[in-house]
Amino acid sequence: MTNIQAFMKNFLGASPEWYKLAIVVFLIINPIVFFFISPFIAGWLLVAEFIFTLAMALKCYPLQPGGLLAIEAIIIGMTNAKHVKAEIMANFEVILLLIFMVAGIFFMKQLLLYVFTKLLVKIRSKIALSIAFCFSAAFLSAFLDALTVVAVIISVAMGFYGVYHKVASGNNLIDAVDISDDRKIIEQQHEILEKFRAFLRSLMMHAGVGTALGGVMTVVGEPQNLIIAEQAKWNFMEFFLRMAPVTIPVFICGLLTCFLVEKFKLFGYGEKLPDEVWKILSDLDRTNSEKMSKQDKIKLGMQALIAIWLIVGLAFHLAAVGLIGLSIIIFATSFTGVTDEHTIGKAFQESLPFTALLVVFFSVVAVIIDQKLFSPIIHFVLSAEENTQLALFYLFNGLLSSISDNVFVATVYINEAKAALTNGVIAPHQFELLSVAINTGTNLPSVATPNGQAAFLFLLTSSISPLIRLSYGRMVYMALPYTIVLSIIGLLAIEFILPAATIWLASLGLILPI
């Protein structure tokens, strides 16, 4: 092995050779285009390359390739470190949210696991269970991080799948076996196992879409919501009310879609929990409930009280979102007996890689601003009539968010809209409506692909996906009815409900114009 071969083996680790080569080519081309052709073209090239790294997140986590491209952009002068720092400081609350709120919810997983386990065992109707999962995921995602909600549901599904797989393989529950190996499955259990997989697939997808339905509603539902709220100067309640003319109709239609796909068994939905599996899981739940000590019950009670504090703290904006998250960490660890530094450290593992990636986003945003990359698009949109502007912003956001990361897309568009407001191109009232269009456009159509929704990508890359045969293509197919309904209802609400509803809410004094 030559030195160059050894270097390329190390470079970006286990990523495919073609992917490594593509990143190297990007790094070589960008300075040439910037210095000898056009900084504007080089800027767009960087944005396209960065979107490519996000779309290829399954090949390599975007932090490394995206970070290399961003560092090179700063070195060659597309932007500067001072501007990157300014972008980071302008969005510091989002960084606090990702660091502390996600970690805080980690210590409340026991309560969430308990709730979803009870739902699965107690509700026998598949339609009712699907709606309950979708609604619960939506409600939780309005206050908690969507990744955490999905992580909890994955934990429940993994636990139940593991239990049934062991029984179907003829093993005891305490046996350590490979649940990805189907070779020992008893012949008559094969069909039941396939039905159970289809059942779990549908539940996971309903819950995933639920996180999008709830996440769009509040400041803390998604990281990009807080970025938009910061620019528009909206607190928790005002953000909720501003979004409500769009998010409430979409939420109702989302639950209706959940009902219809289950009722008529469309797009891979409708499979019920086999009775044999339910009996095994029900017996296990009963055994676990009987084993629960008084100490365990007190832990659940404390976590429920902390959840109430979380909702009250956010609703009345008692502190910055990230600081409320820090208080959750302190309360949850203090009252459930978690005092070991290494155990506490595990809570931060989920959020810190994405927090680092977010800082790279801001570097690319700085390039977009310095090179005025979005000026032609924004000029085109803002030259349209005011009502058409809302639909165009919604559609452009939705299209880009379905293939790229929605935090990145929302940051770019809200910055451009704020610049238009500052320069007197649009009126304050129009900026407020555009902010709603950007938020809903970023959050709703992005359920189309795993690239658009972090929760979907997390589900796709989790260990449960291969077990229940949930591939990228199948996920896109199962999300299709939701994509169509959420996108169209969102667009219609933006066009026909939002302007009049905003004026009505302002007349009641529920929202305050800028």
UniProtKB/Swiss-Prot annotation:
InterPro entries per UniProt: Na+/H+_antiporter_NhaB
Swiss-Prot/TrEMBL catalytic activity: 2 Na(+)(in) + 3 H(+)(out) = 2 Na(+)(out) + 3 H(+)(in)
GO cellular component: plasma membrane
Disulfide bridge positions per record: none
Transmembrane annotation, as ranges: 21-41, 43-63, 88-108, 143-163, 203-223, 239-259, 304-324, 349-369, 390-410, 448-468, 484-504
Membrane topology field: Multi-pass membrane protein
A Pfam family it matches: NhaB
GO molecular function, one term: sodium:proton antiporter activity
Annotated HAMAP family: NhaB (MF_01599)
Function: Na(+)/H(+) antiporter that extrudes sodium in exchange for external protons.
The protein, known as: Na(+)/H(+) antiporter NhaB
Source species taxonomy: Bacteria, Pseudomonadati, Pseudomonadota, Gammaproteobacteria, Pasteurellales
Gene transcribed to yield this protein: nhaB
